[in-house]
């Protein structure tokens, strides 16, 4: 059985945590929140996930700073996920670039990436009730579960 962990930073409305829980349920992963600063599990796991919301076109700074401090590894399987105000495949590639680059430079092999919309009340949006209310929704959760199942086949 594959041993999996997910490093998670979920802020505001816990959108990314909902997605992390869905993926974790399919790959039997332990979720480690970044504020715990726990990296020991990395040594013994086969698959590592990294998830955080997107802010200004990249993962939250807390996730990027955490990734920078990780030890180097050799060809360890990893995946990236996020929630954001706007979703498209092209945007996901761009938004994940900073974290992907850090992880690849540390020796991780990225085997999958996932993104979906999340409820957003940042900046002026709070005055209008936000955007993407109800997201991630049931379809997003199902897609995250399917993503998790695909990770096990990689």
Where are these regions (language model features)?
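FMN-binding flavodoxin-like domain, especially the glycine-rich phosphate-binding loop
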Residues: 2-4, 11, 18, 22-34, ...
